UniProtKB/Swiss-Prot annotation:
Positions that bind [CaMn4O5] cluster: E367
Gene3D superfamilies according to UniProt: photosystem ii from thermosynechococcus elongatus (1.10.10.670)
Species: Fagopyrum esculentum subsp. ancestrale
Name of the protein in question: Photosystem II CP43 reaction center protein
InterPro entries with a match to the protein in the record: PS_antenna-like (IPR000932), PS_II_antenna-like_sf (IPR036001), PSII_PsbC (IPR005869), PSII_PsbC_sf (IPR044900)
Amino acid sequence: MKTLYSLRRFYHVETLFNGTLALTSRDQETTGFAWWAGNARLINLSGKLLGAHVAHAGLIVFWAGAMNLFEVAHFVPEKPMYEQGLILLPHLATLGWGVGPGGEVIDTFPYFVSGVLHLISSAVLGFGGIYHALLGPETLEESFPFFGYVWKDRNKMTTILGIHLILLGLGAFLLVFKALFFGGIYDTWAPGGGDVRKITNLTLSPSIIFGYLLKSPFGGEGWIVSVDDLEDIIGGHVWLGSICILGGIWHILTKPFAWARRALVWSGEAYLSYSLGALSVFGFIACCFVWFNNTAYPSEFYGPTGPEASQAQAFTFLVRDQRLGANVGSAQGPTGLGKYLMRSPTGEVIFGGETMRFWDLRAPWLEPLRGPNGLDLSRLKKDIQPWQERRSAEYMTHAPLGSLNSVGGVATEINAVNYVSPRSWLATSHFVLGFFLFVGHLWHAGRARAAAAGFEKGIDRDFEPVLSMTPLN
């Protein structure tokens, strides 16, 4: 029987509830956790826990590579990406790979390379995960003290936090370098309907970048989700990357202040709950971003936003009826308001009809027709370009509506197509995952606080039903 080198490892707040120190096995008798508690069995086995995390990373990267190649294999260049149920290729296209003017795909080879690179990486991670889970040392503290840790060692934990922050900062700078030096990224606002361009004039003004954080989250303001030019997005990544790297260096060099030592719970389960809370926030923000923002998520690849499809419909019928002789500036609708054009509460000229509620929308195909006071009547009469008509007609018929059975469009629409927008999928999935992560945050935070107070929340270990059932084997 293998006895661990030091008893200190068993004095952190997640106590083992069986009173034994032998960790030769990973069953309920030796760890206090049943098989379905997963990595909880590895709380004190830093080497095995490393294996679990590396293997998990391998699974994630394998999915990315395999799904990437699957999308490449099924991709039809003649159809827009958003009509093909793709969620990975739009991200690669947004980074400027394989696309040209108007978001047209001119080369799918970079997408193939991306998939293969992820598959190769996943094999390396998978090998590392299996090695550390099965063959490597159970604990790292004795052999590799730099990689070892004790959960309640506050200084070591903030050092690990610092390393993670530096890696996140470097990740932010990868996007900056791609946009500045390595071919640029796709700009949906480029003249004539979008193109790949290098970002030359970064927005680094703190009043602009941090002004987004001070905006209201509601219509017309839209908090950080309202960002609508790439200079601000890349400048924001410069700020964020710098803050993460400097914060990481700070956390590596310093020890937690007394107030932080008192205020926070210092245990593995507490760190899990903090991480789940942060990921939950990321999920909710990503949901809003992909649903409303057509700059970071260009409509050429992800399909139009909801407001964009609605405004596109109003625009399409304005174009049609104007050609048929309607005076779009003065025609009245059934409610007495303007049929095609009306005024917003603050006086701008906006599209009339039901789409009036989306008068905030900014989209690259529509902005050239605006003047200082909203939509410009003379431009609407003389200046509409064919590409704007084509794009709005396309967006009108591809609203991000749809159900789980992939029947797209408005429920009452008789000509509905079999289409569900990637925006619907990505927004819904990130909202749902963000919610589940939030519930997990509450669960683990409650357990961690209870353990710190000296008792345990959760399923009763001694009398849970499964213990009285016949073993599966």
